[in-house]
């Protein structure tokens, strides 16, 4: 069974039926990822089955627990080669996706990828999340996602300022999410967020444990956050 057949079968078990067009989009995504990866570091995973399992399937797992089948505005922080937002966009074409990444080479790849996949309502921004979160897009997104970018204490300060009041920040972590959540509660509260839900599950074929943490944005974030680039990582918001 090749990668796309495997993905279609696994998603079908969760009530997601891929059309022929969507299958073609994933196959093109895989081909371009491997091609571009030869000239820039997009991923350490290039084996076909591994990409379909650990990148494509893994990116779509949030939709097993959260309704993405609606015209949400999504900002994906530090998405690298487009994970999780581009696989989600392929499955749920109504999503309006913005990706912010600090490396211009990755933005070039994403622009080429979106054109080849025929995606609309996607935009790719070359910026640091700390700077982007201070600009006109602050507090405008229904959902902000981040997948394995940094510890939750840091991620909260990068992502929550972008979430509009009433929206959600969805952090996708491997194991240790609960431990990170405990450490991040203080900062989440300062930034206007409240813990809502977390889901722990295993990827197929013993490919590892995953955690999805959902934070509700209840209040506007103080204008002093996010702090200047590098500060959230150097001195995260922790209870003294």
Swiss-Prot record:
GO molecular function: rRNA (guanine-N7-)-methyltransferase activity
Protein localization: Cytoplasm
Region listing for Disordered, in residue ranges: 218-240
GO cellular component: cytosol
Enzyme Commission code(s) on record: 2.1.1.-
Domain of life assignment: Bacteria
Protein's UniProt keywords contain rRNA processing: yes
Principal place of residence: cytoplasm
Coiled coil: none
S-adenosyl-L-methionine recorded as keyword: yes
Binding, S-adenosyl-L-methionine: 78, 83, 129-130, 147
Family: Belongs to the methyltransferase superfamily. RNA methyltransferase RsmG family.
Function recorded in the entry: Specifically methylates the N7 position of guanine in position 535 of 16S rRNA.
PANTHER family: S-ADENOSYL-L-METHIONINE-DEPENDENT METHYLTRANSFERASES SUPERFAMILY PROTEIN
HAMAP family noted in UniProt: 16SrRNA_methyltr_G
Protein name, per record: Ribosomal RNA small subunit methyltransferase G
Organism: Staphylococcus haemolyticus (strain JCSC1435)
